[in-house]
């Protein structure tokens, strides 16, 4: 090897050797500054589901919630329920202790509104349409809540430290009466997870 080529290669190999000695995450320019903390994902879970169980533990419905753009889309599908109309709501706590499911907390209401789409001072973000169940014991709805999401950077996030749940009530929601639309007892509940 010529002397000229050796003078060109030696500094390059020296730099490579020094770089190989550094461990991942070392900051050669300022080893005393640990830098900013690692970024935390703000996207959150793409979709959460819940099996809504009655006080005997039987699954009566399945709920799915997902963030779509700047909205929260909720779908509820019932199976094995008596025909009729039932109020359904998102609740603030991810806990469903039978028999009354009061551990699910109040309706999700991050904007501090009154209850119901027909209430001039309403509505809660957690207000959902009535679940209409046919003679075959099945029913479903899909509903989109604007300016809301599961988690992340959206202003109205459903999921916080204590989670959230979906509750079905014994009677239809009148979409007006505060706080729960005269929808009666909580008959099925599921934790979103």
Outline where the language-model segments fall.
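Bacterial N-terminal signal peptides that target proteins for export
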Residues: 1-10
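Intrinsic disorder/low-complexity segments
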Residues: 10-11, 38
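C-terminal motif of bacterial Sec signal peptides marking the signal peptidase cleavage site
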Residues: 17-20
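N-terminal leader/targeting pre-sequences
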Residues: 22-85, 90-193
């Amino acid at each position: 090897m010529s002397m000229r080529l050796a003078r060109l290669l030696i500094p390059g190999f020296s730099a490579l050797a020094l770089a190989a000695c550094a461990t991942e995450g070392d900051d050669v320019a300022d080893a005393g500054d640990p830098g900013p903390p690692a970024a935390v994902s703000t996207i959150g879970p793409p979709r959460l589901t819940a099996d809504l169980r009655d006080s005997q533990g039987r699954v009566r419905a399945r709920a799915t919630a997902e963030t779509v753009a700047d909205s929260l889309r909720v779908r509820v599908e019932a199976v094995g329920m008596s025909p009729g109309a039932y109020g359904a709501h998102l609740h603030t706590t991810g806990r469903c202790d039978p028999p009354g499911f009061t551990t699910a907390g109040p309706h999700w209401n991050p904007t501090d509104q009154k209850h119901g789409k027909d209430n001039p001072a309403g509505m809660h973000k957690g207000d959902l349409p009535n679940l209409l169940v046919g003679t075959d014991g099945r029913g479903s709805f899909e509903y989109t809540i604007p300016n809301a999401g599961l988690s992340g950077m959206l202003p109205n996030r459903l999921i916080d430290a204590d989670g959230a749940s979906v509750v079905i009530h014994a009677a239809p929601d009148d979409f007006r009466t505060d706080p729960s639309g005269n929808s009666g007892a909580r008959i099925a509940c599921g934790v979103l997870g």
